[in-house]
């Protein structure tokens, strides 16, 4: 009896995602304005298991990319904002660069991790 319950439960959890109509989600998009980068991406399935964040890589050094919170003054990222439109959840995260001289040789990468995989998009100040 427990096995039947488990099978029925798993079918109920997975069936809506397997048999759902294909929903189109655009790739990551970055919009720039004075001193900020706005990264937007959408999630088709299980948005609670998705995460959006920014990385920064100093192109003059051999160091790996770093999370924004490890870079100190002159840069910060807002909390991720999510909006729901039907069955699509759109995530958005804004990166604020106030010290453009300090970060003029950096590459910034917006990363969206979902159950479908990882999407990345790069942008530079100059």
From Swiss-Prot:
One GO CC term, this protein: extracellular space
Record keywords: Early protein, Host-virus interaction, Secreted, Signal, Viral immunoevasion
Compartment list: Secreted
Gene3D superfamilies, A to Z: Immunoglobulins
Principal cellular location given in the protein's record: secreted
Signal peptide stretch: 1-20
One of the Pfam families matching this protein, by short name: Pox_vIL-18BP
Family to which this protein belongs: Belongs to the orthopoxvirus OPG022 family.
Function according to Swiss-Prot or TrEMBL: Soluble IL18-binding protein that may modulate the host antiviral response.
Name of protein: Interleukin-18-binding protein
Organism of derivation: Vaccinia virus (strain Western Reserve)
Lineage of source species: Viruses, Varidnaviria, Bamfordvirae, Nucleocytoviricota, Pokkesviricetes
